[in-house]
Amino acid sequence: MSEVALEELPGVGPATAEKLKEAGFNTVEAVAVASPSELATTAEIGESTAAKIINSARQAADIGGFETGDLVLERRKLVGKLTTGCVEFDEMMGGGIETQSITELYGEFGSGKTQVAHQLAVNVQMDKEHGGLDGSVIIIDTENTFRPERITQMVKGLSEKYGMELDPEEFLQNIHVARAYNSNHQILLVDSATDLANELKEMGKPVRLLIVDSLMAHFRAEYVGRGTLADRQQKLNKHMHGLLRFGDLFNACVVVTNQVMAKPDAFFGDPTRPVGGHIVGHTATFRLYLRKSKGEKRIIRLVDSPSLPEGEAVVAVTTAGLTDQ
């Protein structure tokens, strides 16, 4: 990544640079992946000037050009894999949850979506030898489901699993939680997460996991009826691309939980469908469908992936956390 300062970009003076930083565009890379209209509004400049600044940023950060497949393959080696803590689940995911991607967990209430999210928030802090990414966590909580007590239980579970002394307090200090009160606030928190991630990166505690639990709760409550659908999807599209951008900028896993609905015209098969429509379907890199089974058992199905076949894994949600069945 380039170390060019914002002020060094053509057309960006100290005043413009300050406005960009206030809006969360702290690096040349962040400017390079912005849209001209977004930058123009933020910095109070014309769109043509914004487009020139973005082009300069892309050249400085070496972003946005064409490259050959072998170079893409080489760059893919930087992608990390975060263990789920379950062998069968990891194997289905090709080694774990990928960085620089959005992984969607959808299912009915009680299917284990929030439990998986909590487990990942613990696992990501482990070293790479134990399947972690040595990173911090940011959680955008829309339904007040984050429970520090559950994190403590899971850390104790890992202590027993690996025979290590792990301090739950230390794990909790590396989890940064913000409660989102409406959809606008939820989108704004992604910008705040970018600022926080930049600060933590400088402190040597890079963010390797961003969780949104749950993605659609506020959008469903605020946009009721077909007449509001276009506005909702437009706003949701912006939100999803903000999450994708975060994953790319910080080489982080982005995990979103999602609610479901029953499709009334489905006469055969499972009528359960994730909400959010095609916007979420196209933007999520991996889609996982969680279902309840007997007792602690949960069935996790990989429904969509650009590189992996469909598959199922059976896990157990126990007091100690997510384990193999």
From Swiss-Prot:
Domain of life of the source: Archaea
Gene Ontology BP terms: DNA recombination; DNA repair
SUPFAM superfamilies for this protein: P-loop containing nucleoside triphosphate hydrolases, Rad51 N-terminal domain-like
Amino acids binding ATP: G107, E108, F109, G110, S111, G112, K113, T114
Keywords: ATP-binding, DNA damage, DNA recombination, DNA-binding, Nucleotide-binding
GO molecular function: ATP binding; ATP hydrolysis activity; ATP-dependent DNA damage sensor activity; damaged DNA binding
Role noted for this protein: Involved in DNA repair and in homologous recombination. Binds and assemble on single-stranded DNA to form a nucleoprotein filament. Hydrolyzes ATP in a ssDNA-dependent manner and promotes DNA strand exchange between homologous DNA molecules.
Family the UniProt entry places it in: Belongs to the eukaryotic RecA-like protein family.
Protein name in the entry: DNA repair and recombination protein RadA
Record organism: Methanosarcina acetivorans (strain ATCC 35395 / DSM 2834 / JCM 12185 / C2A)
